[in-house]
Curated annotation (Swiss-Prot):
Coiled coil: none annotated. This is Transcription factor FapR. HAMAP family: Transcrip_fact_FapR. The keyword Transcription regulation applies. Transcriptional factor involved in regulation of membrane lipid biosynthesis by repressing genes involved in fatty acid and phospholipid metabolism. One of its GO terms (biological process) is negative regulation of DNA-templated transcription. Belongs to the FapR family. CDD domains: hot_dog. One of its GO terms (molecular function) is DNA-binding transcription factor activity. Keywords: DNA-binding, Fatty acid biosynthesis, Fatty acid metabolism, Lipid biosynthesis, Lipid metabolism, Repressor, Transcription, Transcription regulation. The gene is fapR.
Amino acid sequence: MKKYSKKDRQMKLQVAIEENPFITDEQLAEKFGVIVQTIRLDRVALSIPELRERIKHVASVNYADAVKSLPIDEVIGEIIDIQLSKSAISIFDVRSEHVFKRNKIARGHHLFAQANSLATAVIPNELALTTQATVRFVRSVYEGERIIAKAKVRPATDNRAITIVDVKSYVGDEIVLKGKFEMYHATQK
């Protein structure tokens, strides 16, 4: 692995983050052959925010106007991609406040809230309400894990006021939650 001078590393770090704002400090450390603390110090010196803040910024710039059914700050997790009436993706980092203290397992309502708010966000109308949800928790999620929820809208059926959204949540490549959300929607007057 090539060793970079501090100045070169910081320039390349800035380019790497501009190209992929979702890259982690750990991935950057591996890429540049340094420890994570060095990457953090470089980010601070360059006034580059941590990953969580970069994700929030990208989401607020790209998706704040796209989501009509609820304010972007009411979405549980960070939306990283959305195509109204088609699909959406969000991420949720499980922290200490989301888990049971004794076993560090995430409380189920956080996983449900991420999936349900993503199903709501993908609806292109001002009013979107969950009429029915069928959810299956496949495996426990633990503190420190990152949940990636992916929503897909099914093609319209006869009842145009109801749309079915399927959500699958993953930790890595492993499914942790499967959900089917029936969403009532209308344009408010």
